[in-house]
């Protein structure tokens, strides 16, 4: 979260993560830690704040109309995708900490560096709201790297427009649910 991304630098990404946590605390979903560092959010637009708040505490209202309104408000689909990745990851981590009775983890310092603003040329409009990197040969080398030659459903490719966010999400998926190679293996049993 503290590393420069494709569309935000480390400081911007941390501010978005802190803002998501603040909204969770404000909504009573999370307990305020003693060492809580409130987001400054100096360079966060009202559109981004609205997106972060909705993602953090009311994700059920996100539908295609919501997405299109955010895009029509000036956010690019790449920015939208990266913010989805950052907020979903910190929300996941915070709610997991709450569930096991652990304190919320402290945020690291932002890493220095600029965002790349490189859109993967393999990303195309498929059947999702945002462009994704396809399965199989159409995904080319980046698809092979992300999916390891396995077919991936849209739910796992949703962040692939920003490959590092997709990778980070897949790490959580593997830890909390099932190894990615097992997602479509309906004979797999966690207990074997």
Regions found by a protein language model. Name each.
Residues 1-192:
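Hydrophobic alpha-helical segments
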């Amino acid at each position: 979260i503290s590393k420069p991304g494709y569309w935000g630098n480390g400081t911007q990404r941390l501010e978005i993560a802190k803002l998501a946590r603040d909204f969770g605390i404000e909504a009573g979903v999370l307990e305020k830690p003693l060492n809580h560092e409130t987001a400054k959010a100096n360079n966060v637009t009202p559109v981004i704040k609205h997106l972060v708040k909705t993602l953090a505490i009311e994700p059920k209202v996100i539908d295609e109309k919501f997405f299109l309104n955010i895009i029509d408000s000036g956010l690019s689909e790449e920015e939208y995708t990266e913010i989805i990745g950052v907020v979903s990851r910190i929300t996941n981590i915070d709610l997991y900490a709450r569930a096991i009775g652990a304190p919320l983890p402290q945020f690291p310092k932002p890493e220095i560096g600029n965002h790349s603003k490189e859109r993967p040329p393999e990303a195309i409009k498929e059947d999702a709201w945002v462009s994704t990197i396809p399965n199989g040969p159409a995904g080319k080398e980046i698809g092979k790297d992300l999916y390891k030659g396995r077919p991936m459903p849209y739910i796992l490719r949703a962040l692939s427009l920003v490959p590092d966010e997709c990778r980070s999400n897949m790490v959580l998926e593997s830890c909390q649910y099932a190894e990615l190679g097992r997602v479509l293996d309906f004979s797999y049993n966690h207990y074997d």
